[in-house]
């Protein structure tokens, strides 16, 4: 899924995003 992929990238890119989209990271 493009959405999941983008989420993973964002999460790995910045820790701030990780906290904001931790669910996406865990899901991916």
From Swiss-Prot:
Expression across tissues: Expressed by the venom gland.
Key words, A-Z: Calcium, Hydrolase, Lipid degradation, Lipid metabolism, Neurotoxin, Presynaptic neurotoxin, Secreted, Toxin
Subcellular location: Secreted
Keyword Secreted appears in the UniProt entry: yes
Main location: secreted
Superkingdom of this protein's organism: Eukaryota
Cofactor note: Binds 1 Ca(2+) ion.
GO cellular component terms listed in the entry, alphabetical order: extracellular region
Enzyme class, first EC level, given as a word: hydrolase
Cofactor(s), names only, from the UniProt record: Ca(2+)
Xref: InterPro entries: PLipase_A2_dom_sf (IPR036444)
Enzyme nomenclature, EC number: 3.1.1.4
Record field: catalytic activity: a 1,2-diacyl-sn-glycero-3-phosphocholine + H2O = a 1-acyl-sn-glycero-3-phosphocholine + a fatty acid + H(+)
One term of GO molecular function: toxin activity
Any one GO BP annotation for this protein: arachidonate secretion
Family note: Belongs to the phospholipase A2 family. Group I subfamily.
Function: Snake venom phospholipase A2 (PLA2) that inhibits neuromuscular transmission by blocking acetylcholine release from the nerve termini. PLA2 catalyzes the calcium-dependent hydrolysis of the 2-acyl groups in 3-sn-phosphoglycerides.
Protein name, entry field: Phospholipase A2 3
Lineage, top ranks: Eukaryota, Metazoa, Chordata, Craniata, Vertebrata
